[in-house]
């Protein structure tokens, strides 16, 4: 009977394992989004913080690989950040990695939370525009946070507040090699509106579902019922044996 009970426990464990939750909406065409950003940028050092702020605008698109990790491509343009008379004084085109800290530490619940925090890091091509010849190229790194508010019942729209530090890695080239230098960095603060396209599941986000195989469930139910019958039969045999023992003891 002990063997039967142990086997029953294994069957129940197998049933539980076959009812695990999985995430749907993981096709390549799923979980893409497009965004527009607007805000301001100011030198990190040696300037009046608010007085030196200049406008910045940009667009981007992202692909969420998992509920935790995503990749993004972003282009930003900045106005009046240098003495240049061009419409845009600088542009920064970046490849970004994103980590959803809420899903990382508190797990994904099946749909986006109302408020979430993303950590963002990346690098890109930084270009300075001047009148006539003499445009300059550099490369940038970016570190920031996105404070996201997921709007509506369908969570199709996200409003984000995005502070970031942007480094011009070659700001003092050729005197020094590429490096992180606060004197060649800027603080950027933007607000962004993101639209999340529908996935193959019809939602605008990863869908968490439980996967069942009905044939396996029916087979497991049959096994469980057979084991229950076997346990009941063993209990009956044990009760009969106990009665016989009691009768023999009385005869003695």
Where are these regions (language model features)?
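Bacterial Sec-dependent N-terminal signal peptides
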Residues: 1-22
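Short glycine/proline- and aromatic-enriched beta-strand/turn motifs that initiate or cap beta-hairpins
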Residues: 20-62
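Residues on the lipid-exposed face of transmembrane beta-strands in outer-membrane beta-barrel proteins
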Residues: 36-40, 59-63, 95-101, 121-125, ...
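Outer-membrane beta-barrel translocator domains and adjoining extracellular loop/strand segments
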Residues: 46-53, 82-89, 110-111, 128-138, ...
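Gram-negative (and chloroplast) outer-membrane scaffold detector with strong preference
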Residues: 67-141, 153
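Predominantly the C-terminal beta-signal and adjacent terminal strand-loop region
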Residues: 84-85, 152-248
């Amino acid at each position: 009977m002990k063997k039967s009970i142990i086997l029953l426990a294994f069957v129940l464990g197998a049933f539980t394992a076959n009812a695990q939750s999985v995430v749907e909406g993981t096709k390549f065409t799923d979980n893409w989004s497009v965004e527009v950003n607007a805000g301001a940028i100011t030198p990190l050092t040696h300037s009046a913080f608010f007085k030196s702020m200049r406008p910045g605008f940009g667009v981007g698109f992202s692909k969420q690989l998992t509920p935790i990790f995503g990749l993004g491509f972003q282009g930003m343009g900045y106005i009046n950040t240098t003495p240049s008379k061009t419409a845009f004084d600088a542009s920064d085109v970046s490849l970004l990695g994103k980590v959803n800290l809420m899903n990382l530490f508190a797990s994904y619940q099946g749909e986006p939370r109302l408020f979430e925090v993303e950590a963002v890091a990346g690098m890109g091509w930084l270009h300075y525009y001047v009148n006539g010849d003499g445009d300059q190229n550099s490369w940038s790194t970016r570190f920031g946070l996105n404070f996201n508010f997921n709007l509506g019942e369908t969570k199709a729209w996200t409003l984000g507040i995005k502070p970031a530090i942007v480094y011009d890695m070659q700001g003092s080239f050729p005197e020094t090699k590429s490096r992180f230098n606060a004197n060649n960095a800027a603080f950027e603060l933007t607000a962004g509106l993101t639209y999340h396209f529908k996935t193959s599941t019809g939602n605008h986000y990863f869908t968490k579902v439980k996967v069942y195989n009905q044939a396996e469930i029916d087979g497991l139910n049959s096994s469980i019922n057979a084991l229950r019958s076997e346990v009941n039969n063993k209990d009956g045999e044990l009760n009969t044996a106990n009665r016989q023992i009691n009768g023999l003891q009385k005869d003695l």
